[in-house]
Amino acid sequence: MLVTNKELQQAAREGKYAIGAFNTSNMEITQAIIAAHEELRAPVIIATSTSAIEYCGIEVLSTMVRQMAMQAKIPVSLHLDHGTDFNLIVKCIRHGWTSVMIDGSHAPLEENIAITKEVVKMAHAVGVSVEAELGRLGGIEDNISVDEREARLTDPDEAERFVHETQCDTLAVAIGTSHGAYKFKGEAKLAFDRLAEISKRISVPLVLHGASTVIPEIIEKANQYGAKLGAAKGVPAEDIKKAISLGITKVNIDTDLRLAFTASVREFLVQKPDNFDPRKIIGAGREAIKQVVKSKIELLGCAGKA
């Protein structure tokens, strides 16, 4: 069944767990995400980036995910990830997205507040929840690129004012994570003190972007079959758990799914060179994604919460 992020994250905040927001761009990824959550009876947020919408077409993507969500035995939210174009946000709402993100983090604070208020007013009028972002992440993923020098952490004072003025439903905060597979040059150093202060001062559920763990075994497997991902490094699982204990209720995961898919498809093609059935080839990637998603559900503590 289709629900909103607000509903899922409010329950997560009360229950002290987090919901996974997993990015999709095709049928097989969506199938894997939903199947994993059904098996573990967990609610899920299926996230779609601007580039995924461009890749599939908004009508196709909307119809596919909504149909699967309505047939699912668990609560599913269809969410626009990193929406920066007001017109696209409008289109997503009209095509049945139950939650949208307005990412005005690239703009000065006053401008971010203004555009977020505009989106909130429109979305709330039709029962769609709104995620906003304050502070910036480094790294590259899809159409989001932020130089390390530009990246900045969320200021607690600004966060308190921002939520009060915009009335957004959830807030994505920057505490040191980044997009993509190369998140840290050394050890991960997340700003947990800052997160705790923000969580104490604002009333809405919090979101952590750039939270893939970049599983070493999957990197090793991918490299074994021809990939070149030597320096890939993600957020440690222990840090994810600590962030949840400090108020994070939505954890965005995309890179880990891409890596799992790539590693397993590479393995399949090498081990079965005589197979040319696209369904079998892609099916190997789908199963790998499903297993990774199941491990994330356990990490986030949302198994059995549907």
Segments (PLM) and residue ranges:
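Alpha/beta enzyme core
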Residues: 5-11, 26-52, 58-75, 83-205, ...
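Alpha-helix initiation and N-capping motif
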Residues: 2-5, 58, 262, 293
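A short, mixed-charge helix-start or loop-turn motif at secondary-structure junctions
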Residues: 15, 47, 101, 275-278
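C-terminal alpha-helical cap/extension of soluble enzyme domains
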Residues: 224, 235-306
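N-terminal amphipathic alpha-helix/helix-capping segment at the start of soluble metabolic enzymes
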Residues: 1-20
